[in-house]
Structures are given as C-alpha cells and as structure tokens.
Amino acid sequence: TDMAFLHYRDAAFQIQRAEQVPGQSIAWDMLLSFACSSDDPISGGRHKVLGSKALNIPPQTSTIASHLPKAVGAAYSLGLARRHPPEHKALPDDAIIMCSFGDASANHSTAQGAFNTAQWTAYQSVPMPLLFVCEDNGIGISTKTPKGWIGANFADRPGLKYFPCDGLDIY
C-alpha cells in the first residue's frame, strides 16, 4: 500500500507490485502506454509513462529526477497527517513513500534539491517517512557515475541514513 515514485526504468517494480493486486493487467497497460494509445489508463496516450492508481504508483515520465521533489512532498504530507489527522486520507498510518532513482540522476539539480529538503526536514526533527532507493548500476544516459561515488556521497549526509545493498543478491 506504500506509495512508490519510480525511476523511469522501474517497470519490473511495477510488474511485481501488480502481482499483489488482483485484476491488474499491467503488461497490457504498459504496452498501451509504450504505444501512446488513447486507451492507456494512466496517460490517455499523451506520453509513455509508468504509473498506476490501483498500485499507488503516481505517473512518471522519463524526465530525469523530476519525481524526487514530488516524493519528498508526499512524504512530508504523510508526516503532517500523522501530526494533524486529516478528515480524509488515502494511505494507512504506517505508510512510507518509496522513491527510486538512478545513480546518474543523483547529480541532477532536482534530485539535489529533494535530498537537501529531506535533510533539512530531518535536521528539524520533522517526520518524513521516505525511503530513497538508488539504483547504482553505472548506466547513466549521458553522464557516467564514477565507481563508489554514490556511497561516498551519501554515507555521511546529515539527516540521511545510507545502507548499501546488492540488488542482485535476492536470497
């Protein structure tokens, strides 16, 4: 039920999450999106995007790192809702926001603004239930990320906890 703001290469996450929600035709929906079909349930054919309302995945285009500030805002709203319960809410009390991004995206100005906002908020002890997931695979479109840069850059940031893991080690 947690909301997931996905990197534009995260179709596998969306496909796997669809397994948890009966009645989803995610492969078909993605094909409609990739073909810019007016029947695409998330964009109506306007653009190839990942996303699904039923899966709590807001639409995301291929604009680099544009979803990170939105994820920070959503996480801030969850923290705010815990302090001042709204009349209506869409997510459970224990929800978090997951936000994935690629290693090359980490250097983009919108990503830096999102990280800074998350750190600034944490420094003030304002609740922001947010999990950033960096896919550090060295596959940047235009800018290669030096080996070890993500770990070195995130390991000691105030207000952020960095946990390296091997995404290929699934057992």
Residue ranges and their predicted role:
Residues 135:
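Nucleic-acid-processing active sites and adjacent nucleic-acid-binding tracks
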Residues 1-130, 140-160:
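Cofactor-binding active-site loop characterized by glycine-rich and histidine/acidic residues
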Residues 168-170:
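Outer-membrane beta-barrel proteins
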